[in-house]
Amino acid sequence: MTTDRNLFFCASLLIFLGVLMSYSLSTYTTVVLYHYGEFHFFIRQLVSAIIGIVIMWGLSRVDPSKWFSRLGFFLLFVPPLLIIGMFFLPESLSSSAGGAKRWIRLGFFSLAPLEFLKIGFTFFLAWSLSRTFVAKEKANVKEELITFVPYSVVFVALAIGVGVLQNDLGQIVLLGAVLAVLLVFSGGSVHLFGLIISGAFAISVLAIVTSEHRILRLKLWWSNLQNSLFTLLPDRLANALRISDLPESYQVFHAGNAMHNGGLFGQGLGLGQIKLGFLSEVHTDMVLAGIAEEWGFLGLCVCFILFSVLIVLIFRIANRLKEPKYSLFCVGVVLLISFSLVINAFGVGGILPVKGLAVPFLSYGGSSLLANCIAIGLVLXLARYTKG
């Protein structure tokens, strides 16, 4: 089987597993909390999965020389307009989370424009970096910084928009990480990368200390981390460093219990306890904890192996491509998927603060699923381009 066909089936398998878990982990929430039928979330995710796979297959058949840039610019410019438009929509046409409007209600389906903007932003970076950093000869740090200024302006504007209108620091961190690493892949120096990371860290600290709910999240994270970390230190040192009276992270606490209950082989599909009111949204951001409880450590390893295969296949396609903007886009898709997975997994494990990022393909959410299918579909079209 060819690389692109393997990629299609690998992504489809992850989508199937996500649909399966959307039923297994959401039945209690669906019936008890929302008073829907037990198949409510399952059917919605199944419909999104079918549409996503069809889109993925359809995009794999398009000619990227004609459609890649058109689709990329569409995803770059239309979602921001929708995000701004949501601010003026009545509550009947929009859904809120975290104090911000994030979804447009379209009857059976709710659309989250930010999920599609991430693909558009990745396209913009690939398209633009291929014209600047890739096309230029080796430059010193000062010249690189001058070249980087327009990107920083675009990112700051994006960060302000997402931060103010969407109140979503997690997505800003994700897009910033993609920008920084993609700069290195496009030929930027390690010194430039270090300066960008330093600046991003300073801005992140400022964003945290100016927001009460982010400070609380940081305290919840440190409360859980110090309990695990200080067990490795001598008692006297641990007691000296410990900060008492910190709130305990409800989500991470129950996620840890779920992973402990799952053990090596898991409780069995549908037999987990975490979904029974302990974590009502386990089928979304905490899906890895639900998988760990029902499928065990081995089941979780299977999921990570599938993601690893997916990433390797995309890298192989990127390596075959001669056009820099195409190969950079493929790398950007890898970064979006891998960073989302790692940030979510580290949040569930208590290593990082919980950021609310979905696990690609596995977490419940039609917009996230469709956006990832579009990204994979475009990669598949580029793989077909290498054959032509």
Swiss-Prot record:
Record organism: Helicobacter pylori (strain ATCC 700392 / 26695) (Campylobacter pylori)
Pathway(s) annotated for this protein in UniProt: Cell wall biogenesis; peptidoglycan biosynthesis
Intracellular or extracellular location(s): Cell inner membrane
Protein name: Probable peptidoglycan glycosyltransferase FtsW
Any GO molecular function: lipid-linked peptidoglycan transporter activity
Pfam families xref list: FTSW_RODA_SPOVE (PF01098)
Keyword check for Cell membrane: yes
UniProt record similarity statement: Belongs to the SEDS family. FtsW subfamily.
Its EC number(s): 2.4.99.28
Membrane disposition: Multi-pass membrane protein
PANTHER family referenced in this protein's UniProt entry, alphabetically: CELL CYCLE PROTEIN, PEPTIDOGLYCAN GLYCOSYLTRANSFERASE FTSW-RELATED
The organism's taxonomic lineage, starting at the top: Bacteria, Pseudomonadati, Campylobacterota, Epsilonproteobacteria, Campylobacterales
Catalytic activity: [GlcNAc-(1->4)-Mur2Ac(oyl-L-Ala-gamma-D-Glu-L-Lys-D-Ala-D-Ala)](n)-di-trans,octa-cis-undecaprenyl diphosphate + beta-D-GlcNAc-(1->4)-Mur2Ac(oyl-L-Ala-gamma-D-Glu-L-Lys-D-Ala-D-Ala)-di-trans,octa-cis-undecaprenyl diphosphate = [GlcNAc-(1->4)-Mur2Ac(oyl-L-Ala-gamma-D-Glu-L-Lys-D-Ala-D-Ala)](n+1)-di-trans,octa-cis-undecaprenyl diphosphate + di-trans,octa-cis-undecaprenyl diphosphate + H(+)
